[in-house]
């Protein structure tokens, strides 16, 4: 599964939760940024480890 797909799924889940009033807008934004940051860090780490081999 692609990590970009993972971020898209995360954004979709956040939108659903927002419309159900389970998350505030601020919480949804923070959660999305956290997932995006983790995905970016993973890609960065993966690229660095493949370059060093």
From Swiss-Prot:
Key word Transmembrane helix present: yes
Primary localization: host cell
Keywords of the record: Host membrane, Membrane, Transmembrane, Transmembrane helix
Annotated membrane topology: Single-pass membrane protein
Organism, as annotated: Acidianus bottle-shaped virus (isolate Italy/Pozzuoli)
Source lineage: Viruses, Viruses incertae sedis, Ampullaviridae, Bottigliavirus, Bottigliavirus ABV
Cellular component terms (Gene Ontology): host cell membrane; membrane
Localization: Host membrane
Chain segments annotated as transmembrane: 28-45
Name of this protein: Uncharacterized protein ORF53a
């Amino acid at each position: 599964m692609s990590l970009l797909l993972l971020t898209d799924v995360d954004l979709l889940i956040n939108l659903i939760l927002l419309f159900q009033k389970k998350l505030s807008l601020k919480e949804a934004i923070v959660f999305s940024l956290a997932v995006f940051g983790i995905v970016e860090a993973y890609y960065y780490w993966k690229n660095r480890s493949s370059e060093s081999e």
